[in-house]
């Protein structure tokens, strides 16, 4: 439980390296907010992680990471709900 009482945001957390990172952080006791390109993808990943870690706190959001105001709003909401953001994993890629 090395990450107990820590809050992490993981961009691109619904699959691949981001999902694996979320899984590891939850195993270590962190609260995890993962981002995905769609709310459906975020919800699916959250459901899978909650099934594996039923007592963990994990949430999914889908801000537009190519829009600074969308990112700011998402991070403000996360900080308001979960407190200080201790860890940020910038894993998502953005293409136009």
Residue ranges and their predicted role:
Residues 7-10, 88-89:
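Conserved hydrophobic beta-strands of the Rossmann-like cofactor-binding core
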Residues 52-57, 76-90, 96:
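A glycine-rich helix->loop->beta "capping" turn
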Residues 51-67:
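Rossmann-fold cofactor-recognition segment
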Residues 28-45:
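Conserved glycine-rich Rossmann-like NAD(P)H-binding loop of the short-chain dehydrogenase/reductase
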Residues 7, 14-16, 38:
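Conserved glycine-rich cofactor-binding loop
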Residues 39-40, 62-76:
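The beta1-alpha1 cofactor-binding region of Rossmann-like NAD(H)/NADP(H)-dependent oxidoreductases
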Residues 16, 20, 95:
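NAD(P)H-binding Rossmann-fold N-terminus in SDR/SDR-like oxidoreductases
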Residues 25:
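Aromatic pocket-lining residues of Rossmann-like dinucleotide-binding sites
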């Amino acid at each position: 439980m090395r990450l107990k009482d820590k809050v992490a945001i993981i961009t691109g957390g619904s699959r691949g390296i981001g999902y694996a990172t979320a899984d590891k952080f939850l195993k270590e006791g962190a609260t995890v907010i993962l981002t995905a390109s769609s709310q459906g993808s975020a919800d699916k990943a959250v459901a899978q992680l909650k099934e594996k870690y039923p007592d963990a706190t994990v949430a999914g959001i889908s801000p537009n990471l190519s829009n600074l105001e969308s990112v700011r709003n998402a991070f403000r909401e996360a900080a308001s709900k979960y407190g200080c953001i201790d860890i940020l994993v910038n894993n998502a890629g953005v293409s136009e």
